Amino acid sequence: MSEEDSDSVITDSQAEEEGELPVIQLCGLVEELSYGNSALKTETEMFEKYYSRLEPRDHRMTRLSDIKITAAEFSQLRSRRKSKARGGLDRTLGLTVEQKLELVQKELEDTRDEIRHMRANAERDLQHHEAIIEEADIRWNEVQKAVHEFEKDILKTISKKKGSILATQKVMKYIEDMNRRRDNIKDKLCLKNVSLKVQRKKMLSQLRQKEEVGEALHDVDFQQLKIENAQFLETIEARNKELIQLKLASGNTLQVLNTYKNKLHRAMEIYVNLDKEILLRNELLGKIEKETIQAEEDRAKAHILNDKLRKQLAEFRAPQVMMYVKEKILNGELEKTIKMWERKVEIAEMSLKGYRKAWNKMKTSDEQLQIIRPPGK
């Protein structure tokens, strides 16, 4: 009897007992049966998968076509199963425990192979993405380097000569040089790609020849290759870790370099300020030296004048007392004479003024007489 017959017997017997069981027991029975059905469904799917691997597709299609029967035959078969169930027959066809264990082990091996294959694909995708990220980092560094070179070689030189023909020519020359450099890199990469394709064709032809000769790889070779692949993967992982550490060290080095650059920039600013201050101090020192020289010259002149005055003072001799008295008396007489002549001058001026007044009166009277006197007398 097949599994369908056993299921029909169980369902019929359960259907007869359903009228006698309470609702709580029925719910528990339904839950237990649903759990058992899920386990049986999983087991059936595993068996079908294994059966689909073993049986060819054409034979499987014919077997499925043989299953198609009419509704009448199906009803007769169902009634026959019920009668057999009522008769107490409980023959079921199924797999033994050893066969089930073999199927489970085979399914476990297939699952492990799938996991290994998925892991290899994931590692390959991870390496591919890491290569893309590394290529992007290299490209970004190249772009930053190109920008830095452009700013250093072009922008700083043409910023002082805006609008000039020389600046435009320099920019065009820089663009032409960059295009020529990219063309050279493209040619090199094309040649490298062609050589790699040739090597790939050679390796494929060698592998094809080995397969034709019968030197194809066996299980032992595959195991050896798996071991070598695992070793290479460990080496690649170690190198990737080392690369990550180097990248971290490079990042730290860049941070330290930026810090030292900032310190150098500040030191250069301080150096420029100190240079300016030194120039100002030198100018002030030059002025002070000039003033010092002028003060030395003035001091030398004052010293010479002082020596001269001291010499004159040393050579000075005071006159005698009688001579001084005589000179003083003579000076007093001269002052008296001067005062006397000053009085005489004042008297003469006053008499001159009187004479002028009298002269003016006489002159005016004479003019009046000439005006009054008639002509001809």
UniProtKB/Swiss-Prot annotation:
Record GO biological process: cilium assembly
Subcellular location: Cytoplasm, Cytoskeleton, Microtubule organizing center, Centrosome, Centriolar satellite; Cell projection, Cilium
Subcellular location, principal: cytoplasm
Keywords per UniProt: Cell projection, Cilium biogenesis/degradation, Coiled coil, Cytoplasm, Cytoskeleton
Keyword set includes Coiled coil: yes
Pfam families attached to this UniProt entry: CCDC113_CCDC96_CC
Coiled coil: 95-139, 169-355
A cellular component annotation (GO) from this entry: ciliary basal body
Task performed by this protein: Component of centriolar satellites contributing to primary cilium formation. In complex with CFAP263, acts as a regulator of ciliary beating that connects radial spoke 3 (RS3) to the inner dynein arm (IDA) and the nexin-dynein regulatory complex (N-DRC). The complex is positioned parallel to N-DRC and forms a connection between the arch at the base of RS3, the IDA tail and N-DRC.
Annotated family: Belongs to the CFAP263 family.
Subunit structure: Forms a complex with CFAP184; the interaction is required for functional activity in cilia. Interacts with HAP1 and PCM1.
Name assigned to this protein: Cilia- and flagella-associated protein 263
Lineage: Eukaryota, Metazoa, Chordata, Craniata, Vertebrata
Gene name of the record: Cfap263
